[in-house]
């Protein structure tokens, strides 16, 4: 804040867009909206609706509480009703020269000024502007949290331990689903295997066989899976996502007639890119350098992947990404990445082995080893499997947070065969 001369930050949250707010408070306002206002001296104020008033005393950071019942659900009591503009005036925000608004999205457009785009509800932005003098500058400040130097892009040992729980859980679910696949199962049965321990998902659960998006549907249905179909499965929790796509067959000769070369045309080139990603990422490397390595290994012009080949993971599945063309952001200790390469070859089923890893220097690795020995044992076991069984020369800076990093079975009825490096 001080470096960029912000006098105050206003951080917005709702159920779908609460991670920046939750980073400071430890909770989201669920079915209500909420605001966290932090001034340059560290004083914090929570503005909450009816059903979150009780949460203020549990906040990670100490904060004054203001009840704003308009954040509550429709037709609930409007006791203590206040005008939001008046609340902002009472907080004397009009005395500030520069205020940052933080929703969840950091805009990276080239054709508009990103700092002038706001993803908060209009009634909040309008109330704020009506409370300020014309001299006060208001900008989007999400980059302070999730931008190239954002504080949420670097995790300490405790944060890694918490996020490993979600990544581990996702990979356990995906492996369990892969192992239990059998012809005649319903998509909903598979979807049930992709949930566990009552945890909230960070993405929509995918368990889709055959034709995707029938009737514009994203969700698992009662459709029974059939031999020879393609199937996609995805699950994610705070800390990581696991995803797999392949065929419901046992061996290569059972591939569809028009995709007999599926392994050579799609799967093996993709797997080589995953291997290159895991073997080359390292501390100090520029994001643009890893991007170029992936582009050389799996040429974008031929395989038509159009998103980033990886991105930051935290509470949200995609927070932001430093892995873009010409990115000058250095890979740093404490970063968590989703390996996310999505090839699209006309006429062929896709392939996916998305997983989550952390990057850690020796100091952070030593801290994890001492403070979280069980976590470190899991990481060591995963590294040993990747190096010794899959024959991937895993970068020493990479800590696999999930159990299935580098593990790809394209023929999902064959439970005992996976790709490995020759």
State where each predicted segment sits.
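Active-site neighborhoods and metal-handling regions in enzymes and metal-associated proteins
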Residues: 1-422
